[in-house]
Structure formats: structure tokens, C-alpha cells
Amino acid sequence: MRKGNEEKNYREEEYLQLPLDLIVEILKKLPLKSLVRFRCVSKQFSTIICSLRDFIESVVTRHLAQPGQQLPLLAVFHHCVPETFFTVSSSFSQSLKPAIYNPTTKRSVGLPEIGPPVTGFRKCNCLFGYDPVMDQYKVLSMVFDFRELTQTFHVFTLGQSQSWRRIQGINDGKLFPSAVGICIDGTFEFLRFKRDQDCLFCDNETQHIII
């Protein structure tokens, strides 16, 4: 009797085993939150969802193509933006030590401090984005000093940087400190202002140094 059950179980396992390419195609159709839960199904599922580059890029592309998914990648320190997919926030001590939090995976990555603590006369905005050319995730910080009417820019590259990199040479106008930036085709776009007019600032190839 036991031998018969073992043969039956073996046949069922053999029947239920699907080709890898079919599993990948099925997983691509699932919502992001379902993919997060399915990482614990097996080592194979975890490898596909977390490490397979083509799979990850396909899922991200499909998600961004859905209506209503073009979300701003911006969070102001000490302020929650519920529409963002990723948020950047500092601690309650008002130090410029941000963290990137992914609401889908419930994981966060702490970043080094940017500079002195935020005071009532300074404001810091951060943008989180992906550089498809270098295959890197980066954070751009913009600290605006209301007393000095100056703004400083720093960039942090995830997985490589141990500190923030100061960006120099941006003197023709100041970025509007409350503007919401969006990522379009791999570049950030947001508003900036000059003394006499408002204009649109786009981080295109000629100004790639900002990213």
C-alpha cells in the first residue's frame, strides 16, 4: 500500500512540475504585492522574483505602463506623500540622515547624513530614481537655505557610495524647493524658478551631471 502511495505522489509531482519559462510568464502577470508574498514559496521563486534581471525589468515596465502608475518619486523630510512608490524620510531628530522605504516589500535602506541638522530656515527635498545607462539607483538631495537664498545638491548612489557627492556648477536659477519631480524616460523633470520667470527644468543628457 505504501509503495502505491509513493508512486502516486511521484506521478503527481512530475505532473505538477512546470517549465521554468512558463513559471516566469505566470509570475509576470501577478500584482507586485503577490510577488512579494510568493518569494517564500520556494528557492526557485525567490531567485526569479529577486535576482532575475529580465524578470524584474519586465515587471517594473508593466507596472509603470498601467494607468495611474506614473507617480512622483518625491518625499519631503518630515512629510509623508502617500502617492509615492518609494519614500525618502529623515528621523525625528531633524538630522539629514534619510532612509529609502519600499512600502511593497516593507524594507528600508538607511543612508549617511547629508549635512547639518535641518533648521527652521532650511528645507531638504529628495528624489529617488534609476539610471538605466549605468544600471544604478540614485538619490538626489536639494537643500534650500531660506536665509541665504542658496541651494546645494548632493547625489548618493546605492550599492556603491559611502557618502554623498556634492554637485557643483548649478548657478543659473534655483530649483523650486516644493516642486514635485517625476521621472520620464530615465530623466527627472521638475519646476525651477528665476527672478523674473518660471521655467521647466529637465535633466537631459546635457545636464546629466545632476543625476
From Swiss-Prot:
* Domain (F-box) ranges: 12-59
The parts of the chain that form a coiled coil are: none
- InterPro entries from the entry? F-box-assoc_interact_dom (IPR017451), F-box-like_dom_sf (IPR036047), F-box_dom (IPR001810)
Q: Domain of life here?
A: Eukaryota
One Pfam annotation reads F-box
Return the Gene3D superfamilies for the record: 1.20.1280.50
Q: Which PANTHER family match?
A: BNAA05G37150D PROTEIN-RELATED, F-BOX ASSOCIATED DOMAIN-CONTAINING PROTEIN
Q: What is this protein called?
A: Putative F-box protein At1g52490
Organism of derivation: Arabidopsis thaliana
